[in-house]
């Protein structure tokens, strides 16, 4: 038996246990959102208390994620379009240095509030390990829904509607 086979067989139970524990820790729909604090690149601070009465869209992304880059333009568009209806969009970069993110944003600007992972505990709370991940928190501070992976604009709009956001009737230009 090769060393690789032995390693795989011996580590599999540990990995399964770790995955199970992570799954148990992830907040579920209709549960209260975990207490958090996030500071944007412009110095704005967001907490559970500061978003009460609004709908929050937490977008977990990275600079190397192709799906994140593909979806960024419509995510930003939705964030801007629905801000007057009470939507707060926080784009949380996961696992990269501020220098890396700033360099990326110089080349690929975003029209939303950017949060560095090192300035928040949100990524750990939502077991952000694949990207993008979208989490919607409703006006009462509960998880309205979560989407792991790219799903397109229509899927994101449906997720936001679950939080009670009054979406415009005309979304004919959505993907």
Language-model features: locations:
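A short beta-strand-turn-helix
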Residues: 36-56
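Conserved Rossmann-like nucleotide-binding pocket used by diverse enzymes
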Residues: 34, 47, 61, 88-90, ...
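Bacterial N-terminal signal peptides that target proteins for export
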Residues: 2-15
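Short pre-active-site segment immediately N-terminal to redox-active cysteine/selenocysteine motifs
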Residues: 54-56, 61-64, 130
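Hydrophobic beta-strand anchors of alpha/beta hydrolase catalytic cores
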Residues: 57-58, 89, 134
